Amino acid sequence: MENKKENFSEWYNEIIDLAKLSDKRYAIKGMNVWLPYGLKIMRLIDNIIRDNVDNKSFQEVSFPVLITRSQLETEFEHIKGFENEIYWVTKGGSEKLDIELALRPTSESAMYTMFPLWIRSHQDLPLKIYQIVSVYRYETKHTRSFIRVREIHFFEAHTAHVDYGDAERQMSEYMDIWSSIAEKLCLPYNIDMRPDWDKFPGAKYTLAFDTLMPSGRSLQIGTIHEYGENFARNYDIKYLDINGDLKYVSQTTFGLSERLLAAVIGIHGDDTGLILPASIAPVQAIIIPIPGKSFKEVLDYSGKILSMLKDINVRAEIDSRENYTPGYKYNDWEMRGVPLRIEIGSREMESSTVTVVSRLNKKRLNISIKEINNIKNMLNEHDKQLTLNAWKMMEENTVFIDDINNIPMNKDVLIKAYWCGSRECSDALEQKKDVTALGTLYNLNDSGKCIVCGNPGRLSMFARSY
């Protein structure tokens, strides 16, 4: 396997192939096949997202994949932002369609033509819905599994509110939801206010959740958008307030994608393979029976341990594959990122114990089956240590710069600097180091002199990005 530090790009591609997460050999570039193990992980991520939004009174929906051209063109700024990425359907069978149809690049245009039918009075608000679907974008840049693809596994939440203040409260709720999701995935991140030229098309402002990959490049792993009344005015989404006056709703959205899985792979993995957070590991503990004279009894004992683990809601399996040595199985499951390995031989059976090996630090611990509940604690500790390691990696590769001439030129890092917010100064940094402005750090009132022009600026982040 490639060395992660020396060649992250090759390591990343190789581990996706070895762990059988997806197969990129499908006939259409950028439309990859989800393989069983990768899909199981993604479904567990989806479950975390669902649990968090369901707890905040969101309702799940499912909209059609096709959108008419007129639906898309209702909001000019929105369609302008996607016009070069849209897949168009122009024929039905052998007949040319009278109305061109698009595969959804996102679902504002589809949903907001329905909102006026659902929203009539203040009693219908807030409206909070979401869906987890595929969206389609004709990506012309270099495609990369889970990072830049043409068919995107996508979560999108959409809300409508009585006024801007209530929409802003929703934005705060999104951040609480995101914090919980990121904690479960053990991911570090900054919250960056995107510059106006990089905000979501049609939004008043965009907040992005950006993490740092081991390559030194930034990866956007989530966004929330405040729309105000921009979309409501174009799609005529109005309601009668408590006084009987007709008003436009204010709207927000929240988007996440399979890039969450990309971040988990890249940030947590090592030269042995994946290291999965326990929260999304399809197998949290793998039981490896050790062959010997009493192997049938060892298998029976392993089955007993499996039942005990399932009783405490640990996702566990027994690797009873024949013609494979224990050593091969150890390496195979380590490569797949399973948090804990449980070795069971005649010695463990005779002493009513199990030997537990951590994927993260390789430490071995022999515990009595009376202490089997400790497996849950070990999984929690696994995730805590993953989180600490991930935040440490990002912090160690974040550099504060107060002079444009001090930008490190020999490696990619996350650059923190004061910036006035102008496009000119952002372009100057890009020419110097080939970095782009991720935006100003959200909710920080820290101010200083812009690293380029010396005018007043706010603390901001810059990086090469995927």
UniProtKB/Swiss-Prot annotation:
Example GO biological process:
prolyl-tRNA aminoacylation
Question: Does the keyword section mention RNA-binding?
Answer: no
One GO CC term, this protein: aminoacyl-tRNA synthetase multienzyme complex
Transmembrane segment boundaries: none
Q: What is its main location?
A: cytoplasm
> Which InterPro entries does UniProt cross-reference here?
aa-tRNA-synt_IIb, aa-tRNA-synth_II, aa-tRNA-synth_II/BPL/LPL, Anticodon-bd, Anticodon-bd_dom_sf, Pro-tRNA-ligase_IIa, Pro-tRNA-ligase_IIa_arc-type, Pro-tRNA_ligase_II_C
Q: Write down the top EC class of this protein.
A: ligase
The protein's annotated catalytic reaction(s) are:
tRNA(Pro) + L-proline + ATP = L-prolyl-tRNA(Pro) + AMP + diphosphate
Cite a single Pfam family from the UniProt record.
ProRS-C_1
Q: Where in the cell is it found?
A: Cytoplasm
Q: Name one GO molecular function term.
A: proline-tRNA ligase activity
Task: Tell me its EC number(s), please.
Answer: 6.1.1.15
Q: What is known of its domains?
A: Consists of three domains: the N-terminal catalytic domain, the anticodon-binding domain and the C-terminal extension.
For this chain, the family text in UniProt reads: Belongs to the class-II aminoacyl-tRNA synthetase family. ProS type 3 subfamily.
| Function, in words | Catalyzes the attachment of proline to tRNA(Pro) in a two-step reaction: proline is first activated by ATP to form Pro-AMP and then transferred to the acceptor end of tRNA(Pro).
User: Assembly and interactions?
Assistant: Homodimer.
Q: State the name under which the record lists this protein.
A: Proline--tRNA ligase
**Annotated source species:** Picrophilus torridus (strain ATCC 700027 / DSM 9790 / JCM 10055 / NBRC 100828 / KAW 2/3)
In the UniProt record, what gene is named as encoding this protein?
proS
